[in-house]
A protein has these predicted regions:
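Bacterial N-terminal signal peptides that target proteins for export
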Residues: 1-10
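C-terminal motif of bacterial Sec signal peptides marking the signal peptidase cleavage site
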Residues: 18-21
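Conserved functional acidic sites
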Residues: 23-252
Length: 252
């Protein structure tokens, strides 16, 4: 059980991030989001394969068995379900890779519960050779940007912006999540050429960096494309490791 508690942290973070995106009440503010909502990208049934790696290493994260599927779309409010599968051997390997093996059980449990509550994850560990974790989350995706409801605890009246495609480098905004934690997001780069690799393709992207108080992560960078939405998430851990997730849009 202690290995399970420690090792589910990263998958929980990854899934919740992959099914995120944002907006606000002020019509001129960074969290206001308009645009077309009837997009091929977000039709029910669309599936988003992912690839996870830690550059410079043969990370056990690359073995993660995943499935992320759109299960509902109500006027641009999209429900995505992420499911990851793993076994006890993978769990032990991830614990060692994260360098958290020495933490006492109560500390591991507290960290895990923080993420589980934040992202509403459900774990089935009945069969230690075929464990699963499921995350269901709602987001808003339009032709103008993306919004997420994870930070508001699922409150659809409080979306928070990950990106608006007309933003520029240096644009920055802050908000407080459902737990009272201040989150800052800043546009750190905007491509003028196709320079971000997604499989066999190169895309123009906007990178938005997020900082917040977090037990494991120093910062998170969301990588988005104006046509394909979220195509990458880069997480920098407090121990200096970069966890790089590439998202393969079904319409690419």
């Amino acid at each position: 059980m202690k290995h399970l508690l420690a090792s589910l942290l990263v998958p929980c973070v990854i899934l919740a991030l992959l099914i995120a995106a944002c907006s606000e009440d002020d019509p001129t503010g960074p969290n206001d989001l308009g645009g077309e909502t009837n997009l091929e990208l977000t039709q029910v049934g669309q599936e988003f394969p992912i690839s996870i790696s830690v550059p410079g290493t043969q990370s056990i994260l690359s073995e993660l068995k995943d499935s992320i599927v759109i299960t509902a779309n109500d006027g641009g409010i999209v429900t995505m379900r992420g499911i990851v599968g793993f076994d006890s051997a993978w769990v032990r390997g991830l614990e060692a890779e994260l360098g958290i093996s020495a933490l006492p059980i109560p500390s591991k449990r507290a960290i895990l519960e923080t993420y589980m509550q934040r992202f509403g994850a459900v774990i089935d560990s009945t069969d230690k050779q075929a464990m699963t974790m499921r995350v269901d989350a709602k987001l808003k995706v339009t032709s103008e940007g993306m919004q997420e409801f994870v930070s508001s605890g699922g409150d659809l009246s409080r979306p928070f912006t990950i990106v608006k495609y007309d933003m520029n480098v240096g644009d920055s905004w802050e908000f407080t999540d459902a737990d009272g934690v201040k989150i800052t997001r800043t546009v750190v780069s905007k491509s003028t050429t196709d320079d971000y690799e997604v499989g066999f393709w190169y895309l123009k992207v906007i990178k938005v960096e997020e900082t917040r108080e977090d037990p494991l992560m120093e910062k998170i960078t969301y990588v988005t494309n104006h046509k394909f939405g979220l195509v990458g998430v880069h997480m920098l851990t407090k121990t200096g490791k970069e966890i790089k997730t590439i998202v393969f849009p079904p319409t690419l």
